[in-house]
Structures are given as structure tokens and as C-alpha cells.
């Protein structure tokens, strides 16, 4: 927490900003309860919000306190200057050093899901930078160059290694999770100068 930004830990299960079906209990609701001065660039539903994490993902969110900080953070995210590192527990053996370069977009059949089969797919790049293996699962450190909705979950499922207990992209691997959040992210964010 400083004059420009506040960094908060978003728990798994919490939605970042209000949307249809999620008006209360969001990260924005909690922020506004504690901090009244946030950047107005995101409007009333997304004040100070520069990036987001999926509902099921826990991790750090950086929030802009004023418009200048918001603009600088948005520029850094747009220019891919922010290092976004995630940790994911997945089924199977995944080799470190793997690059997944598969465009993704809204699934043409199941509209609530994201897929590699979308006609309006956008560039999405995921890299597995570290992997540890134990009894049929891999604990991965993953970096994303892009930040598409469900990107890591879709990419890992597309290569046959879904995130453990993922109800949407886990396929036959929908076992109960060993921990409430098998996907955690990001562990490092670059704050504005």
C-alpha cells in the first residue's frame, strides 16, 4: 500500500468486480469498504482495477489509487512488461520449458467456456518454466505473455494436462482438490515507477 497503488491478495472463489450474478462480495466491494480513493478510469464497477484473476484463482491484484497510476499500469500490462507468474497443480507429467502457443476464444458450442476451437480466437502464449512431479501430478510454475480469460486452464487442458479439480476444463479428471485453489497467481507484479 503506497500513494499510487495497493496490492491485495484475492482468495479463490472471489470475483474481482461486480457483474451479472455477482453484485456483492467482490474484491471491488471489499476495496471500496476500506479505500474510498481509487482511480476512476475503470468506472463505478471497476474502480482502480487494471487486471483481474479468474474467480477460482487466488493471488495478487494490483489496484491503482489514482488515474496516473492506472494509466501507467495499463500501459505496462498492454506492452507485456508485467511478469505474470502462476503456480498450477496439473494431472500428468509436464516437462519444464514447454511453450503453449494456441489462440483461444469463446467456445462456439458451450458459450460459457473458452476454447482453442473458437473462430474468434486471440493470441495466447503460456510457458511452463519449472515443473516438479509426484505420483501422477505435476506442480508447475507457469508464465503467461498474454492474459486471456481461463488461458492457463484452457492451454493445460488442451495439451492433456488439466488443472487438478478444474470443473470446467478438467475432463475426466474432476477429482476433489487437495487444496482449495490448485491454480495460484500471479506471484510477482511490477509496480509503476
Regions found by a protein language model. Give the residues of each.
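RNA pseudouridine synthases
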Residues: 1-193
Amino acid at each position: 500500500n503506497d500513494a499510487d497503488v495497493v496490492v491485495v491478495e484475492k482468495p479463490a472463489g472471489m470475483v474481482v468486480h461486480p457483474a451479472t450474478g455477482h453484485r456483492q462480495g467482490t474484491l471491488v466491494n471489499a476495496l471500496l469498504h476500506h479505500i474510498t480513493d481509487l482511480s476512476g478510469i475503470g468506472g463505478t464497477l471497476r474502480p482502480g482495477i487494471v487486471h483481474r484473476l479468474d474467480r477460482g484463482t487466488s493471488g495478487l491484484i494490483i489496484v491503482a489509487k489514482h488515474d496516473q497510476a492506472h494509466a501507467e499500469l495499463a500501459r505496462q500490462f498492454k506492452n507485456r512488461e508485467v511478469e505474470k507468474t502462476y503456480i498450477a497443480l496439473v494431472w500428468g507429467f509436464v516437462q519444464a520449458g514447454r511453450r503453449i502457443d494456441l489462440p483461444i476464444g469463446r467456445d462456439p458450442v458451450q458459450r460459457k467456456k473458452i476454447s482453442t476451437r473458437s473462430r474468434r480466437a486471440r493470441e495466447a502464449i503460456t510457458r511452463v518454466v519449472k515443473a516438479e512431479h509426484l505420483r501422477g501430478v505435476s506442480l508447475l510454475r507457469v508464465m503467461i505473455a498474454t492474459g486471456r480469460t481461463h488461458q492457463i486452464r484452457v492451454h493445460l487442458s488442451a495439451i492433456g494436462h488439466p488443472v487438478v479439480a478444474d470443473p470446467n476444463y478438467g475432463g475426466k479428471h474432476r477429482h476433489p482438490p487437495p487444496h482449495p485453489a490448485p491454480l495460484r497467481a500471479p506471484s510477482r507484479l511490477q509496480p509503476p515507477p
